[in-house]
Each structure stands twice: as structure tokens, then as C-alpha cells.
Design a protein with these regions (language model features):
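Acidic/His/Gly-enriched intrinsically disordered linker/tail segments
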Residues: 196-262, 270-271
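Hydrophobic helix-coil surface modules that form long, contiguous segments used
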Residues: 1-172, 201
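Amphipathic alpha-helical substructures
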Residues: 253-310
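Active-site-adjacent bridging/hinge elements
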Residues: 95-100, 147-151, 169-179, 228-244, ...
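Zinc-dependent metallopeptidase catalytic helix centered on the HExxH motif
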Residues: 157-221, 280
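Second-shell loop/turn segments in exported
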Residues: 106-115, 161, 188-189, 250-253, ...
Length: 310
């Protein structure tokens, strides 16, 4: 449980459940947020006009926004007094009909962010039922427009671009980090290839559904692989198993993203989708929250596949 104290008219977007919506949101705004938790439609919780006309938050000098989140490794939040607020939700566990909230907070001039809830709902469904095919483990995901592209448990901080496909790909990538490193508890500083490599792989796989295989292949090759295969420096081509803290520059990027992702896709091709997913689920089930290291991944995938993959 944590609290964010901000002046009136500032909205705080944080990870976890908002515990006191009636204490910080106006009687017109709070019901919209509540409705969004059970609705498939994309709703404007707060428009720019409403934000500018002081119609969104309770008009105390300061408001204290209280949040509660379970099973998280980090806390972050974003605040603004002029961001648009959209929300929807979707079923992420078909067996239990459990839903997750998808929200976005952004500058009204950012055209790509106007699609972020729509794209995010699709990503939540895909990651929950296709790849990795594990129900989204949290109650909410919020995309906040910022000045970097960075993942946090239940939140992503994304920069605005004019390229719609690229913006969707970036959001997909950051949301995929829900599983690696957060769900698994991976040490991303030491083993970046164990989280960035998977996020890159899931970004590519969901991209095939969003823009078609031909375009997804082209983007993957140009954005994730080309720098690696055209790098003339042998010194930068270090083994993927190298600790991420021991490589830098292009070598770090190659190992963490493209090379690692290619290794996962190669194993997927070797085993076939069904057996690969079985092995992946075994790895995730056994090591969820237990901070696996590379050898845990190797052994768990071999055990899950029923083969010696060394």
C-alpha cells in the first residue's frame, strides 16, 4: 500500500488498485472509472476540457491517492493536471473470467496515445491466451506518456511518436515485460537477455497478428537484427551468457535484444509451437517469483520438453 499526495486538479496514476476513488475524484468521474473495470468499451474517464475546467478531482488543496498492489518488485506512478485519461478492461483469464483494467494517460496532442487503450486491450488478451499464454497476473496496466520507453510492474512509460506501428510495437514490448522480468523475478541488470530477449520475442509474435507476418518480419530484421549482423566489431560479439554488466554499447544491445530473441525463436522452431509452449509454461510455473538464472532456464526448458536440449 502506498499514497501519492498531490495538489487539486492533479490526477495520480499508479500501479495497483485505487483504494479511495470517491475521496479524490468528483461524483461525475468516479463512476466512469468504476464502470470501466467491467466494460469492454473504451471510455474517457477525463477529457482535456474536464481537466482544464477543474471537473475531475475533488477540490481540496491536496488530495491523497491511495493504491494497493500485490506481488510487485517496484513502485512507480505518474501525475498530471492536463493529461487525458482513457480506460477499458478485458478478460485475461477465460477460465475464471477475471478481468484486468487497461488505462492510458497522455497529452491530447499525442495521436498515437489515443489508440493506446485499444492496443493495450489487444495485447493483454494476446499475452494471456497466445504467447506466452499465461493469464496477465495483475489487476491493471497503465500506459503513461513520458520521455522514455521503460517498463514497470503494471505501468509503462512511453514516449510519443508519429509512427503508429512503431508506437504499438513499443507498447507491446513494454507490456510483455510483465512476464519477464516481473512475473519471474529475473535480475535484469545481470541477465538482460532473460527479460529483453523474451519481450523482443513476444513483440515480434504479437506483431505478426497486428500487421501481418511479412511486415513483422521486416520490422524485426531491421530494428532488432540488422545492427547485430552488420556490426564489424568482433569485440562486441560476446557470448549471450556474458553477464550484462560486463558488456556495453552495441554489444549490450545485441546480446540483450536481437541475439537473445533469435535463440528463443530457434528453440521454438526446433521443438514446434506445442512442445515449446509446454516447456515454456513449465519454466514459468516452476520459477515464477523465484529469480531464475540462465541455468535454471536451461534445465527447466529441458525438463518441460522432456529432452536434453544441451
Amino acid at each position: 500500500t502506498y499514497s501519492v499526495k498531490v495538489p487539486k486538479d492533479y490526477v495520480a496514476w499508479g500501479k495497483g488498485d485505487l483504494l479511495n476513488p470517491a475521496a479524490v475524484l468528483t461524483p461525475a468521474t468516479a463512476p466512469r472509472l468504476k464502470e470501466s473495470y467491467t466494460s469492454d468499451k473504451i471510455m474517457h474517464i477525463a477529457t482535456l476540457d474536464e481537466m482544464m475546467q477543474h471537473k475531475v478531482t475533488v477540490q481540496n488543496d491536496f488530495n491523497v491517492w491511495k493504491f494497493k498492489a500485490n506481488d510487485i518488485t517496484d513502485v512507480c506512478y505518474g501525475v498530471s493536471k492536463n493529461y487525458v485519461w482513457d480506460a477499458s478492461s478485458t478478460i485475461v483469464d477465460p477460465k475464471t473470467n477475471r478481468r484486468a483494467s487497461m488505462q492510458a494517460a497522455y497529452n491530447d496532442t499525442a495521436e498515437d496515445f489515443k489508440h493506446y487503450v485499444e492496443w493495450g486491450v489487444h495485447a493483454l488478451k494476446y499475452f494471456s491466451t497466445e504467447w506466452p499464454g499465461v493469464p496477465y497476473p495483475f489487476v491493471k496496466m497503465t500506459s503513461f506518456q513520458g520521455y522514455a520507453d521503460m517498463e514497470y510492474p503494471m505501468m509503462v512509460n512511453d514516449s510519443h511518436t508519429d509512427n503508429m506501428q512503431f508506437s504499438q510495437m513499443v507498447q507491446d514490448h513494454e507490456m510483455a515485460h510483465t512476464y519477464f522480468p516481473f512475473y519471474m523475478g529475473i535480475n535484469e541488470t545481470r541477465y538482460a537477455y532473460m527479460d529483453e530477449g523474451w519481450a523482443t520475442t513476444f513483440e515480434y509474435l504479437i506483431g505478426q497478428e497486428e500487421v501481418g507476418k511479412e511486415q513483422a518480419d521486416k520490422t524485426y530484421k531491421n530494428f532488432r537484427i540488422r545492427k547485430y549482423i552488420s556490426d564489424p566489431s568482433a569485440e562486441e560479439d560476446q557470448p549471450i551468457i556474458s553477464m550484462s554488466t560486463q558488456v556495453s554499447g552495441a554489444g549490450y544491445g545485441n546480446n540483450s535484444y536481437g541475439k537473445a530473441s533469435l535463440s528463443y525463436l530457434a528453440l521454438k522452431d526446433l521443438l514446434g509451437d506445442e512442445l515449446f509452449k509446454k516447456a515454456l509454461h513449465h519454466y514459468m510455473d516452476v520459477w515464477h517469483g523465484k529469480h531464475p538464472i540462465p541455468w535454471d532456464y536451461f534445465n527447466a526448458m529441458s525438463a518441460g520438453a522432456g529432452q536434453n536440449l544441451n
